[in-house]
Amino acid sequence: MSREAEEQLIERLHEPKTQQAAFAELVKEYSEPLYWQIRKIVLSHDDTDDVLKNTFIRVWTSIENFRGDSKLSTWLYRIAVNEAITFLNKQRSLNN
C-alpha cells in the first residue's frame, strides 16, 4: 500500500461515517501478511486464526490511538506480534 493510500485509509478510519468501510478495507489488505507473520510465531493454523482475530479486535478498539508516528503497517505488525507473544505466554502458563 502506498504512503498516500495509507494516509487516506487512516483518515477514513478516524471518521465515524467511513470507519467501518475503512476497517473492512484494512482487514482485506492486511489479513494475509499478518496471518503469515503470526504463523511464524504461533505455528498452528487454528491458533494463528485466533490470534489474527484478536489482533483485529485490538486494532479496532485502539485505532483512535494511532498517531501516525510510524507506518500503519508497522503498527499493525507490532500489535500482531504482541498478540502472538501474549497467546504463547498464556499457553505456556496453562501447560505449567
Predicted regions and their residues:
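Arg/Lys-rich amphipathic alpha helix in sigma70-family domain 2
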Residues: N65-R67, V81-N96
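Short, charged helix-capping/linker segments at alpha-helix termini
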Residues: E15-E25, Y35-N54
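N-terminal module of bacterial RNA polymerase sigma factors
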Residues: M1-P33
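A short, glycine- and basic residue-enriched loop/turn
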Residues: H45, D49, I63-D69, S73, ...
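Short alpha-helical functional segments enriched in proximate histidine and acidic residues
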Residues: Q37, I41, S62, E83, ...
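Structural recognition of an alpha-helix C-terminal capping motif at a helix-to-coil junction
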Residues: W36, D50-I57, S70-N82
